[in-house]
Amino acid sequence: MKRSVPQDFNLVYPYKAKRPNIMPPFFDRNGFVENQEATLAMLVEKPLTFDKEGALTLGVGRGIRINPAGLLETNDLASAVFPPLASDEAGNVTLNMSDGLYTKDNKLAVKVGPGLSLDSNNALQVHTGDGLTVTDDKVSLNTQAPLSTTSAGLSLLLGPSLHLGEEERLTVNTGAGLQISNNALAVKVGSGITVDAQNQLAASLGDGLESRDNKTVVKAGPGLTITNQALTVATGNGLQVNPEGQLQLNITAGQGLNFANNSLAVELGSGLHFPPGQNQVSLYPGDGIDIRDNRVTVPAGPGLRMLNHQLAVASGDGLEVHSDTLRLKLSHGLTFENGAVRAKLGPGLGTDDSGRSVVRTGRGLRVANGQVQIFSGRGTAIGTDSSLTLNIRAPLQFSGPALTASLQGSGPITYNSNNGTFGLSIGPGMWVDQNRLQVNPGAGLVFQGNNLVPNLADPLAISDSKISLSLGPGLTQASNALTLSLGNGLEFSNQAVAIKAGRGLRFESSSQALESSLTVGNGLTLTDTVIRPNLGDGLEVRDNKIIVKLGANLRFENGAVTAGTVNPSAPEAPPTLTAEPPLRASNSHLQLSLSEGLVVHNNALALQLGDGMEVNQHGLTLRVGSGLQMRDGILTVTPSGTPIEPRLTAPLTQTENGIGLALGAGLELDESALQVKVGPGMRLNPVEKYVTLLLGPGLSFGQPANRTNYDVRVSVEPPMVFGQRGQLTFLVGHGLHIQNSKLQLNLGQGLRTDPVTNQLEVPLGQGLEIADESQVRVKLGDGLQFDSQARITTAPNMVTETLWTGTGSNANVTWRGYTAPGSKLFLSLTRFSTGLVLGNMTIDSNASFGQYINAGHEQIECFILLDNQGNLKEGSNLQGTWEVKNNPSASKAAFLPSTALYPILNESRGSLPGKNLVGMQAILGGGGTCTVIATLNGRRSNNYPAGQSIIFVWQEFNTIARQPLNHSTLTFSYWT
């Protein structure tokens, strides 16, 4: 049988006649194969493959693509790229991004963190909160006086009295009289000054001093007065202050009185003596002299007579009495008696045993060296002018006839002549409260204990005796200035805090906001700060990747585009056919099992070709486009062909070696990946991968209620706050104020700033001084000292207290024989710390009541009998007030007369030593005089026990008319 090959040759069933038995097919072993399933398949090797639809396709790799015409052509876009551009396994150009960059809406964007945001122009900017502002493209502090910014940072403008001390802390310049104690400004308090309950300086006053009219004065008791601003002893009759300032008796020395052993003594002449055991001047009665009723009398003998209580001579012939003198008629001053001529003696004259005429001396008088002298006792002396004076010591002195106290050189101690009191002149800042000198602190000062300290509010504190400013995070002290610590990305520029704009960032001139300065090269576009690749036909972005768009019968296999297959229709098969692989019988049809890449086309077996492939007279071959050629059965790039130029837009650029990405400021490559280049003060968050600011101490992120982005804020604590305009300012409390943009102390009275040293000091007024350790203390004058409690008190000889009968006018003496008080006795006993008691006494009676006296009246007595506590006891005819002045409950024992100096009389009829007696001459109110004797430690009678006492006896009344008993004030003294 002769075969013929039809024009349309069927490779599967090439026979025209249908036969009942199946013959094995025939096929060319070159390109076809029968697989294990007895299916005829094409034998292909890579880069040929089958797509999902079973079409034979060509896998293209890097640098090759199939154009829309189905031709292969070179694609250098993926074969020559430079970091941060890269190509994936499919040959797609990608952008390697590192921390700080991400894609948003398929756009490259910077990932910003707290404190940074994008403005309306998509420029990176810093969000500033209160206290921060952006000026000249720099972040700076917005301050208000006394805060300011310098090239060194945030500083505090300080006024006088303030400076930066150790450890750069705010400190007060303290001068003399001030110190820092317990973190507070205080006045150094010296002796004599204390701090009262109102935290004011006050003088610490001891006994004998008081505060009056805001001055410290000496309390003058009875017997003392203030004259010419000096404490003076008020001297009465018989007392005076000598030129040496000593209180003494006022006597005329040499006239029967004199001082011996600091005691007033009577100089006795002939005819006078002191009987043994007695201190009384007694007469030696001679012939013609007798003592009757304690009076010296002359018994009238022959030739004598008593005439008008005077001894007179009964003159005879040849004698006459002339001017009370018996004389011869022929000679004056002589008289004859018993045939003898005798001298005629007048009052105060007498004769001794030898017949000499002598002076009759009374108590307190004596005859020495032929002269009658005053016998001066203790505390008295005879002055150079022969007058009886008192022995006194400074500060007592005589001013005219009065005893005064001298305050010369005593500083602030003054004398108020209106009320007779001492005072203390005080300067500004001091006042007197409750008899104490107080310091009046001004604003910003309070008392802490006894110390004057500044009243400080946070963040001011006391450190190392200086006022300091407590610094929070972000604030430090350097070169005596308060500075702001800056972290990475921040710097100081023109005295302001600014953000360092690194590569890829810049400040937009109109809004002064930080923005990106990115630029793009060819193949990329920059839209709204996002870099986008320019995609051509056949490319799209899916899942943030650039991929090739696949058409019909195309698929990806092993990273390459592959053509798909079309299932051929099954050939008509005769009934009851049997077949062997790759043939099979199905539904009475003989079918050919086709593998990928084979299809039945027009009832003929055909290859299913993908893009870039074709069948010509040479068989299956590749369709090559421009830039490619087949050489020796191998597909190669045409060396002489014109390369395809990629279409690139900024920031993609064409270089000699391929496609590159132009990087602008703020971008850099890190291990071939594009990332944001952060400068000082900025970093990439390691977790969230966004760009954020690095905040140092004192800065933080905040989120206002009306904003969605975080802003940068200055962290402040009181006294630093933000004003209404957001400026950083400084709150000042009591004691501080801001003047001329500087923080200054508010100085009250008693404080000032030295204009040279700028130290805070206490201006000193009169009576104050700066002592050791710069303490303010009272400058004491003569007569003043500090006691053990640092109070100002008078010197030992000036410490006084007074026991008295008060100033009432009611009668307080019941005379013997009466049942009710009849006279008012005023008695004051002023005791000095030396033990000397100065007494003043007077008595008053009137027509309505009281004791009346006349010439020759018998003696009257006032008994002041005292127990061992100085209280009046039974037997005293003094009653009523008997207390210590200004301290009624105080003990009176200190006023008792000394029993060693003045022995106690144990027998009522015995005699006391003369030193127990004080004789005084009183001037009666109705005219005349009387003698007053003060008896110390005498006894009233046997009916009353012996003990300490003061008994006043009035006698020798010399008056011409009957009158009530009242007389001048008498002054006396005794020792305790």
UniProtKB/Swiss-Prot annotation:
<dbReference type="Pfam" id="PF00608">
    <property type="entry name" value="Adeno_shaft"/>
</dbReference>
<keyword id="KW-0945">Host-virus interaction</keyword>
<dbReference type="InterPro" id="IPR000931">
    <property type="entry name" value="Adeno_fibre"/>
</dbReference>
<keyword id="KW-1161">Viral attachment to host cell</keyword>
<dbReference type="Pfam" id="PF00541">
    <property type="entry name" value="Adeno_knob"/>
</dbReference>
<dbReference type="GO" id="GO:0019028">
    <property type="term" value="C:viral capsid"/>
</dbReference>
<keyword id="KW-1048">Host nucleus</keyword>
<dbReference type="InterPro" id="IPR000939">
    <property type="entry name" value="Adenobir_fibre_prot_rpt/shaft"/>
</dbReference>
<comment type="similarity">
    <text>Belongs to the adenoviridae fiber family.</text>
</comment>
<dbReference type="InterPro" id="IPR008982">
    <property type="entry name" value="Adenovirus_pIV-like_att"/>
</dbReference>
<dbReference type="GO" id="GO:0046718">
    <property type="term" value="P:symbiont entry into host cell"/>
</dbReference>
<dbReference type="InterPro" id="IPR000978">
    <property type="entry name" value="Adeno_fibre_knob"/>
</dbReference>
<keyword id="KW-1233">Viral attachment to host adhesion receptor</keyword>
<keyword id="KW-0946">Virion</keyword>
<dbReference type="GO" id="GO:0098671">
    <property type="term" value="P:adhesion receptor-mediated virion attachment to host cell"/>
</dbReference>
<keyword id="KW-0426">Late protein</keyword>
<keyword id="KW-0167">Capsid protein</keyword>
<keyword id="KW-1160">Virus entry into host cell</keyword>
<dbReference type="InterPro" id="IPR009013">
    <property type="entry name" value="Attachment_protein_shaft_sf"/>
</dbReference>
<dbReference type="GO" id="GO:0007155">
    <property type="term" value="P:cell adhesion"/>
</dbReference>
<dbReference type="GO" id="GO:0042025">
    <property type="term" value="C:host cell nucleus"/>
</dbReference>
<dbReference type="InterPro" id="IPR006626">
    <property type="entry name" value="PbH1"/>
</dbReference>
<protein>
    <recommendedName>
        <fullName>Fiber protein</fullName>
    </recommendedName>
</protein>
<comment type="subunit">
    <text>Homotrimer. Interacts (via N-terminal tail region) with pentons.</text>
</comment>
<comment type="function">
    <text>Forms spikes that protrude from each vertex of the icosahedral capsid. Interacts with host receptor to provide virion initial attachment to target cell. Fiber proteins are shed during virus entry, when virus is still at the cell surface.</text>
</comment>
